Amino acid sequence: MMNKDIEIRTMKIEDYTEVMALWKSIKGFRIRAVDDDFEHIKRFLDRNMGLSVVAVKNNQIVGTILSGHDGRQATFYHVCVDSKCRGENIAGKMVKEAIERVNAEGISKITLIAFKQNLAGNIFWKSQNWKQNKDINSYELVLNEENISSIVA
């Protein structure tokens, strides 16, 4: 998908180094030691082939969406745009493309987590007509104590 100088394309494992550099450049971005390492991102991409996307501008990755599903519903992870490229509707273009790909799989619902302190992200999702689900609490059970979260400062 091309729009001006932005290309939205499938994320490949060969993008990992550049994608990780982007994630590490975004203030407040949460990276997990195990889940976000090369091996686990490769496993995710292989399991959900063709669903994750990157935005490319001037031959540089400036946005990502990790997208996968379990057969019932999809989840978006690590939706981000380089802070220098915000305001260009890159996130909107990536979301549209990722939704089309999930829809083609016959999935009718997508969820995501937007951390409460991510004000820009929460404003974005509301502007895209996503509804905050106030009926649920989110829980997690850490099975690998080495899978610690770090937040980019």
What do these predicted ranges mean?
Residues 54, 60-68, 75-78:
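Conserved beta-strand in the GNAT
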Residues 112-121, 140:
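Conserved beta-strand-loop-alpha-helix junction that forms the acyl-donor binding cleft
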Residues 81, 87-100, 127:
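Conserved acetyl-CoA-binding loop-helix of GNAT-fold acetyltransferases
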Residues 42-54, 75:
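A short helix-loop-beta-strand connector motif used in the catalytic cores of GNAT acetyltransferases and
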Residues 6-19:
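A short beta-loop-alpha structural element at the N-terminal edge
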Residues 102-114:
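Conserved GNAT acetyl-CoA-binding A-motif
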Residues 68-77, 86, 133-135:
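A conserved beta-turn-beta hairpin within the catalytic core of GNAT-like acetyltransferases
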Residues 127-131, 137-153:
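Terminal substrate-recognition subdomain of acyl/acetyltransferases
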